[in-house]
Structures are given as structure tokens and as C-alpha cells.
Amino acid sequence: PTELLFNAAAEEEYMEDPQETEKIEEALLAQGYFSLAVPMPYEWQDYMRTYCEEYGCPYPLALAVAQTESNFDMDAVGASGEVGIMQLNPGPGSSYHAEIQAATGLDPTTTSGNIAGGCYKLGLYLAKYGNVEKAAMAYNMGEGGARSAWDSGITSTDYSKAVKEAMETWECTVNAWGGV
């Protein structure tokens, strides 16, 4: 007998119902989990909320970095090869991407992996350095560059100020729609 490799009838049972998906999204939007104010698809908002919680990164901080780094553009590529919505630098021989992949279990060049990697780094730096401006500086300059700046008496940069300002705006936006 011939073995079926694909059973279309069985597959239809497990396919998502678009109407059901829409109802779930509407309910999550009504509850404040998703927001029309966030210029990302709901799936990406879900990734960001999930990874923020997992890695100890405030959701408004992750939104602020995504806005500042790429204006929420997953296809963005920076001058030094940074990629994705969170503009993750691959590092020498892709060593930074390897570190992120080892920590998160996800490929940082995919949307979920890029968001996870950014949230991981932000949560790590926030826990390590204790405030948003220092965490933003380490995220943007690397830890060595940030330490060098701090040793020279520089405690903030235009980038860290922009992130902090955007974070404060996102905090107001998030609180306004109950999406804490």
C-alpha cells in the first residue's frame, strides 16, 4: 500500500481559523495587550511582550530602542552591519549573534530572534548597570565603549537621551491603553 505523506483532510483540522484568530486579536486589543499605537504587527508585539517578560526588560524600553534603532523596520541594516528591528550587531565573525543565539535559542536574523536578542541584551544591561541611560549606552556602544565613556565622565549620550525620551513617551502610551 502507498503511504500518504500529506493528508489534506487531516491538515485542514489543524489549520488556524482566520475568524478565530481575528476574534482572539480583537480580545487582546480590547484588553490592552496589543495596541494600534505600536507600529508593529500583533505577532511582533506578542514577541516583544513575551521576551521583555522573559529577560527582565521593560516593554516601553524595548519599544523605545526599536523606534530609535530602526523605526520598527525589520529590514533595516545599519552602517556597521546591524540588522533588524533591534539593530543587532553581528560582531567579529558573527560572535555577537552567536552569543545571542546561545542565550535565547533563536536566530537573531529572524523577527522573533531579533526581538528576543534585543530584549535579552537590554534586560542584561539594565540589571547590570541599574539605569536606562547606562543600559542604552551599553546597548548602543557596546560595554567597552560605554565603560570608556563613563570613565571619561560621560553619563549620557544623544542616543541614550533619545531612548529615555522615547521610553517615557511609550510609558504614557502603554499606560493610557492599559497595556503596562
Positions of the model-derived regions?
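Catalytic and substrate-binding regions of cell-wall glycan-acting enzymes that process beta-1,4-linked
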Residues: 127-180
